[in-house]
Amino acid sequence: MTKEMERFRGGSWDSAYTYLGAHPAPQGYTFRVWAPHARHVALAGDFNGWQGADMHRDEDGVWSLTAENAAVYDAYKYVVTGADGRTVWKADPFAFHAQTRPGTDSKVYDLSEYGWHDGAWREKCAAEPPVNGPLLIYEVHLGSWRRHEDGTSLSYRELA
């Protein structure tokens, strides 16, 4: 077992997103999902006509495949056959982007293309680390908290 996956299984690898999920490759994107008890995992998406392509399992239980035709914003899911023989279509737990409801597909995304706008906040944190102050965690499921009159969900910007 690799050191990183050992830390992942122990709950202490805080950078698993750098390995698992969909990541740019020299040609296309490489997809990885941890499913140690799965009998079989396939990758299906816009880039292969939703025809599941067999993924390859390593000794850590990580299934991987590089899809040469995958591009940013392509939708995809993992087709997982569990130890019980049942097959389910699953979203990527490490996806950087997802469909808007009611869709549940994961979407290919390249974080290097995102324009971050948090420079002022990062400077403030460098000068005054937030870990030295109080912590407040408020959890809310935005989709069930407030909606438009027609029942559709508000965007993050509308809720802000």
Feature names for model-found ranges:
Residues 1-30, 50, 54-139, 144-151, ...:
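The feature marks proteins involved in alpha-glucan
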Residues 34-41, 48-50, 71:
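Short proline/glycine-enriched turn/loop motifs at strand-loop junctions of beta-rich domains
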Residues 41-43, 76:
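Short beta-strand elements bearing conserved aromatic residues within extracellular beta-rich modules
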